Regions:
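C-terminal, beta-strand-rich globular interaction domains
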Residues: 320-324
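Intrinsically disordered, low-complexity regulatory segments
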Residues: 1-317
Length: 324
């Protein structure tokens, strides 16, 4: 890897033709190549144009890499402007604590990158499920339903899982992890359509990409019921993961059923939702800023810029109060 890095050291001038030639020459080493390219992309301001072109070139000339790594067409991340590139590098940089490397391109980590990118591309909607509603959805049956019944309002979104539910995921080496969040992505491919789910367990060692995740795909093949598709995923996990092979609780089925029920809840006509700021101080300051005027309003806006103004959509608040 050091040799390749040195070879690329003078690579970020304006020679796009040389860049593409290098990609073609080292197509079999594309994971390492991309690791180096994006590391250098955030180090030099003029690198963005080349990085965008190179990223597109890699996945145009070596599409099999994306297909093999994540089982789907990767073309949606061929960026067309620098904002998307910065978004990508920001995601990867924070997710890996600034460490780029081959681990980013192993199948598990590619799934994590894929779902994160799809989530951000669809507007980064996060749903926080109230514990009471979460328990009701955990106990709700999905018999008779198929993937054609799943019509969420967004192409991709994230669900924060109430810890009170006790949901979990299993990974080799570290065993069971509490399930923290679920990424759901609608997969409308040319040959099949369905949903992809990534279940992210809490890290036991606080390291990024510690593989505390599992992923599943539910596709509309022969209009099979969702319960049957979930059971197939459980059997598949049992073949490759020891924890699921000795799992009387059918954890994969339980997790998928719960995520499916959240999607179904989002399509109800009487969905109970409330937009909440992650930082409670932001909500108060936004209200005060809207009511202020003149210099006072300007000062409050300056304070507001220092706070985290991201929001989550809280589902089922009154259900939680009835259950508490």
């Amino acid at each position: 890897m050091n040799g390749l890095y040195e070879m690329l050291s003078g690579f970020w001038r304006d020679d796009l033709k040389a860049s593409r030639a290098l990609v073609a020459e080292h197509g079999d080493r594309a994971p390492i190549l991309m690791s180096v390219l994006f590391q250098k992309a955030i180090q030099k301001p003029r690198a963005e144009r080349n990085a965008m072109a190179i990223f597109s070139q890699v996945y145009a000339d070596a599409a099999a890499l994306g297909e093999d790594a994540i089982g789907t067409d990767f073309s949606f991340v061929r960026f067309t402007h620098s904002k998307r590139l910065r978004m990508f590098t920001d995601v990867v940089d924070r997710a890996t604590h600034g460490l780029f490397g081959k681990q980013l391109f192993d199948p598990v980590s590619m799934q994590q990158v894929f779902h994160t990118l799809a989530f951000r591309r669809a507007g980064a909607k996060t749903f926080q499920v109230a514990p009471g509603l979460g328990r009701e959805l955990l106990d709700t049956d999905v018999r008779g339903l198929s993937t054609t019944d799943l019509h969420a309002p967004y192409e991709a979104f994230r669900i924060w899982v109430p810890p009170e539910l006790g949901l979990r995921v299993w990974v080799a080496g570290t065993g069971w992890h509490p399930l923290a969040e679920v990424y759901a992505v609608r997969d409308g491919g040319s040959t099949r359509s369905g949903w992809r789910f990534l279940f992210h367990g809490l890290s036991k060692n606080n390291l990024a990409f510690d593989n505390a995740i599992t992923f599943h795909g539910l596709y509309d093949e022969e209009d099979k019921p969702l319960e049957e598709l979930a059971a197939e995923q459980q059997r598949l996990m049992a073949q490759h993961a020891e924890g699921y092979a000795n799992d009387p609780e059918q954890t994969a089925v339980t997790n998928l059923r719960w995520a499916i029920n959240v999607i179904l809840y989002l399509t109800c006509t009487n969905v109970e939702r409330e937009h909440r700021y992650l930082d409670p101080r932001a909500a108060k300051l936004v209200a005060k800023t809207n009511a202020a005027s003149g210099k006072t309003r300007g000062k409050m806006k300056a304070k507001l810029r220092l706070l985290d103004r991201r929001q989550v959509i809280y589902l089922g608040g009154s259900v939680a109060s009835r259950r508490s």
